[in-house]
């Protein structure tokens, strides 16, 4: 998996979460317990934060990118 920190902010991943090797987690992203991020998924928390809660599944090829106009993404 690709983990990209920026300005001291690094994605946070619960130890029980599954992250597929081909996924990208960028800057302010948090993955909750027992959650899974599947193949070729991109979570871009470079503008606002992304919080994937506990027991959540983000499927193959998903792209989640928060906008500064709409606030953070929480699931």
Regions found by a protein language model. Give the residues of each.
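Extreme N-terminal tail/first-helix region
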Residues: 1-15
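A structural motif detector for beta-strand N-caps
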Residues: 11, 16-19, 23, 29, ...
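A contiguous binding-surface segment within folded domains or other stable secondary-structure elements
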Residues: 66-75
